[in-house]
């Protein structure tokens, strides 16, 4: 049985929530190993704010890169059929024929660093859709007020997506909602099953 994808629990935990949602998206509840869930929460929210409070700047790029490496090694050695890859800079692009695009077409998913209200944010990309759109699950699930075209709300697919966004918008270099921003700050964590089972 597949789990519904979940919203973040605070203003700061979009990173680990998206990693957890990647596992929920790819695997049946009965397949998920508790050690995977524990490790996601242990490694997330590793930053400190100016006042020295843990987690108040969310999850660092270093932690997300580490989690991609950890997923890959855990998949190789612990009987959990998962693989992951961390893409950054120019490699972190959502374009037809690109690496991230292919992983989504083959049933994988990608945790993407983007912007929301000009603040860094993570979302989970889950599907390539018609009309040049990508399906994604935004864990900050408030009813948005989209002021420009290219983004829309999806209802009734709690195990897969709650937004559809044109891929050209994802690749923008500004800080508009769901844009990845400048090349230097881009991150994609690609995650997929390695046993060939369908994720839908």
Where are these regions (language model features)?
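Long non-globular sequence segments
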Residues: 26-27, 31, 116, 199-200
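Intrinsic-disorder-associated interaction segments
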Residues: 60, 93, 178-181
């Amino acid at each position: 049985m597949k789990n519904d994808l979940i919203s973040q629990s605070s203003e700061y935990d979009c990173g680990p929530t998206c990693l957890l949602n990647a596992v929920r998206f790819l695997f049946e509840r009965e397949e998920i190993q508790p050690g995977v869930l524990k490790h996601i929460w242990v490694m997330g929210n590793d930053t400190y704010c100016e006042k020295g409070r843990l987690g108040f700047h969310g999850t660092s790029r270093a932690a997300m890169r580490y989690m991609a490496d950890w997923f890959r090694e855990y998949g190789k050695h612990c009987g959990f059929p998962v693989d992951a890859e961390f893409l950054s800079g120019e490699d972190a692009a959502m374009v037809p024929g690109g690496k991230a695009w292919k992983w989504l077409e083959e049933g994988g998913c990608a945790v993407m660093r983007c912007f929301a209200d000009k603040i860094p944010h993570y979302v989970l990309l889950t599907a390539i859709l018609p009309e040049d759109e990508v399906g994604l699950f935004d864990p900050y699930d408030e009813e948005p007020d989209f002021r420009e075209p290219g983004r829309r709300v999806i209802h009734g697919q709690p195990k897969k997506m709650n937004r559809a966004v044109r891929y050209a918008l994802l690749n923008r270099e500004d800080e508009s909602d769901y844009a990845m921003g400048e090349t230097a700050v881009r991150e994609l964590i690609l995650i997929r099953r390695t046993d060939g089972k369908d994720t839908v």
